[in-house]
């Protein structure tokens, strides 16, 4: 009888361990590439060609992020919207948002084994300093950019609250008071035409001025801002973030530490300084580019990412920001880059579009950079209880009654030569590091436990490639 009881206990323990370990094994990794350009803006390939190229490399998920609008304007005061110079290149809005969405749908239907997700790269705002007459005209923050992901309604693009967006005939709410005032003035002038003497002349003047000012007010512009009144802080970007969120889309700050934003561009200067502080100043965005073609510092221990994540843990933010890899892919071989060097790997239960989007929204993914096809792989990053009955992966919350146990397993898709350094970070503090060669397995028991506290763990790997994980949150309970 005692032996039977022991057997039952062992079976229960075995079931609990298997159940907990299956939390991670229930998910399958699906590689994707974010931040692709097509011929709808400044990319070299049409969407169908991008799909064929990705399939040949085993990449199953593509995020098309063409520029929604590539335009700059400078107008002469006081009629800046009438006496102006405008430069515009190919973009979603210039080519047609409806055409863009329909083409993605057509290619998706023709390639059911691939997942193609629409989006855009956007520049909500920039501002001018200097003068065109003195040769020192400078556009500031024109390359301070946000990726939009998951919007599938053409009207959502046509009404984006960004500068110079006149691609919808719908008058924005912010412009209605001015439109009503000028319309009333025009009607008053029309009435004055029936009067005699100087009143009739005044009526003509009022009507002409009303029409001119109405045209100059640009009532179809979707942004309440203009580029002539200096820096407006985070307001234009927060407006865009909130607009996209209200329509079910996601937003990611792109290239927050850009090194190429200051240069001569034809007769003008463009000046976009690194903007990592945007991660702190804005709210409600989904994440940011934690890995791209430049060195960055925001992911360093106790850097800006950790500051924002700790704000979330303290209840000062509604959601944490997730990290993704952004490819900025325009052409195979351009600047030495090829499709597949920068990937975001999603953990999903089924390879479906809705599952990919949910994994992205929930942070169940990691960013990786290699030299395709030699790409490092994060086989496991998990936090569990000591007895393995509770276990979580990136993007998840776990509640623990004791010390956390962290497990990291790394390998590579093809043999990789060279050393790697793996760092484990707890709430901004570097708590453990290991150097070695791939494949590599790390198990670390963290002697940290404070009931009532919320913390997180994240890891990165550098050397023979780069991996940046998303955080796993831990709630300590008694």
Regions found by a protein language model. Give the residues of each.
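Bacterial N-terminal signal peptides
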Residues: 7-19
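C-terminal functional module detector
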Residues: 2, 23-29, 41, 47-51, ...
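Active-site neighborhood of phospho(di)ester-bond hydrolases with catalytic His/Asp-centered motifs
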Residues: 32-36, 61-67, 91-95, 117-120, ...
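Catalytic domains of carbohydrate-active enzymes, especially glycoside hydrolases
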Residues: 50-68
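Structural recognition of alpha->loop->beta junctions
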Residues: 270-296, 345-355
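Extended substrate/RNA-proximal surfaces in nucleic-acid metabolism proteins
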Residues: 83-91, 97-278, 430
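Acidic/histidine-rich, surface-exposed loop or edge segments in extracytoplasmic proteins
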Residues: 30-37, 77-87
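Non-catalytic positions within long, well-ordered alpha-helices that form the structural scaffold/packing
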Residues: 55-56, 245, 281
